[in-house]
């Protein structure tokens, strides 16, 4: 039997989204898991706050080019990748200019909750799953961290229930600093 495969899906990861407790945990937990011999893949939304040049993000052409249907409209899925050098770990970024170009993660400049966060969350969660499918990478465990990832467990158990890639997967959802109402 090969290495256990763990998919980490988060809304924040240091060094990309700033130094928050959630971002630190989302960086350290995969690192420690990898040090124990597990095969790790990490996913993060490509928020407009993430500096592509500084973090050396580049598009993965073979994975990009899919469209996801959200609210009856096609939206282009762009996949980018970067490495956390000191950890020797790759991070995949789910991108779409319509949803993630803004310079704010979840709130508008005035501090109000973005009105399209629901669509952004749907796009991100579906984008992660579709990218894993396109990679053909069968995870043993999927660990979702933060409210923005909360649809992944439901999608895996309901929408993708018959998919052999996710047939025996264990799903963990970590609620972390759940300050947003309705989650």
Outline where the language-model segments fall:
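Catalytic cores of nucleotide-sugar-dependent glycosyltransferases that transfer UDP/GDP/TDP-activated
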Residues: 1-183
């Amino acid at each position: 039997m090969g290495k256990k495969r763990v998919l980490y899906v988060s809304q924040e990861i240091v060094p990309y989204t700033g130094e928050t407790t959630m971002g630190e945990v989302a960086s350290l937990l995969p690192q420690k898991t990898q040090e124990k011999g597990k095969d790790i893949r990490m996913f993060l939304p490509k928020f407009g706050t993430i500096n592509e040049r500084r973090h050396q993000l580049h598009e993965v052409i073979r994975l990009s080019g899919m469209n996801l249907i959200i609210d009856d409209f096609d939206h282009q899925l762009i996949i980018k990748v970067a490495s956390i050098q000191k950890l020797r770990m790759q991070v995949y970024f789910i991108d779409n200019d319509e949803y993630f170009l803004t310079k704010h993660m979840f709130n508008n400049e005035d501090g109000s909750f973005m009105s399209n966060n629901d669509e952004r969350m749907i796009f991100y969660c579906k984008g992660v799953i579709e990218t894993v499918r396109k990679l053909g990478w069968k995870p043993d465990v999927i660990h979702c961290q933060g409210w923005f990832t909360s649809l992944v467990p439901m999608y895996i158990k309901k929408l993708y229930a018959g998919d052999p890639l996710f047939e025996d997967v264990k799903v963990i959802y970590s609620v972390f600093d759940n300050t947003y109402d309705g989650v």
